[in-house]
Amino acid sequence: MRDPKERLRDILEAIAPIDRYRRSDRLRQTLLDALLQQGFTLVNGQLVPPDPSCKDNIRQLYVHLRKEKLQEAGSWLRSVEDKVLPYFANGAEVNVRRIHPVLEFVDSQFKADLFRYASLLWSVPVSAGYGRRMRFLVWDEYNGKLIGLFALGDPVYNLRARDQWIGWGASDKNERLYHVMDAYVLGAVPPYSYLLGGKLVALLAASDEVREMFQKRYARQASVFRKVVREPHLVLLTTTSALGRSSLYNRLSVSGRRVFISVGFTEGWGHFHFSNGTFEQVKAYLREIGDPVVKQYKYGGGPNWRFRMVKRCLIHLGLSPDLLHHGIKREIFVVPLASNARAFLRGEETEPVYYEMPKDSLFEYFKHRWLLPRAARDQRYQAFNRESIRLSRRLNEEG
């Protein structure tokens, strides 16, 4: 019996015949094959994404992108693995009552290598971020091992739920989006992930220390294109869940105040499912046919530009732009760092009134609210062996 995917390809070719000697048709076949491999199916003559209400289906959409990223990193990964792996704890090295987190800014090649290696561990590949970027490692001072990592970067320009929560008009947003950063990487690594370390990392991203480092890093700096020097007041973080509704950020409160506030969901459109080795082909094709969108990249337009690139390519290839609808509705969170964050971002107040959120106070709250109760009822972390996350082994197994 023939593979179901082969039968689907036959049906698709009958709908839109493919000349394999034409570059456009070869690219069209490549894109369709990639979608089929990620779980898209043919319904009433249309390719539709897998059911996004099932988190396993969502993970399947990411499988090929993650595999591609591992393969791209192969030679680098093998060159650094033995250097970075000892900085991941074995379960026996974790003393729950003596954990003490320390924040470290990524400012060296070794730290960058450790950050990159750790981010490749997750089942959902992480973005490289856009524009301004600040990356952090979170260490356990007691044993010198890595707890987790996070990164802040420029936020996307178009995010309706965020803009509605703030109460932004276009002119206010253009003027004050500078004071917002997006947490595009946020999570813990094992064995700390077993101990709800992701909640700790999320809280630390909102700490006074991070906000103060932002102010120091961007003080007296002119913006890239407008050459405007602004006071670097970081008053709001945003982030989105990877797999629909988030259990990590929901109910993440400190002393009765909700730190991460859910403001809605994305609409399930994007280009990530065209990023698994095909985006460069898309860009090369558009450049070859002279589509002006290739040259339209501008500051702040990173993800939107990629979206437009893929959309234009689909149209040129005779495919529906609806293929950009992957169906994954990510939950959107805002993290106000000041009690008057919304008024400040609307231009109604000139100085932010910051919450007091020192790192050590946040950890003490996390320790008693989540860490110690979790460690008492779930001892899986104790059996963790860092060799189980050796990525070169996974790379060899996946070919």
Where are the language model's segments positioned?
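Solvent-exposed interaction patches of small proteins and small membrane subunits
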Residues: M1-D10, A14-Y21
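Short, mixed-charge, low-aromatic patches
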Residues: M1-E6, Q71-S75, V156-D163
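Alpha-helical structural motif
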Residues: R7, A14, F110-L114, T278, ...
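Non-catalytic, regulatory and substrate/membrane-recognition segments associated with hydrolase enzymes
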Residues: I15-A16, R20-L32, G39-F40
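Extended effector regions of multi-domain proteins
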Residues: L32, Q38, G45-K55, R59, ...
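Low-complexity, highly charged intrinsically disordered N-terminal segments
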Residues: L36-R135, W139-N143
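Acyl-donor binding region in acyl/amide transferases
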Residues: V102-P125, G131-I289
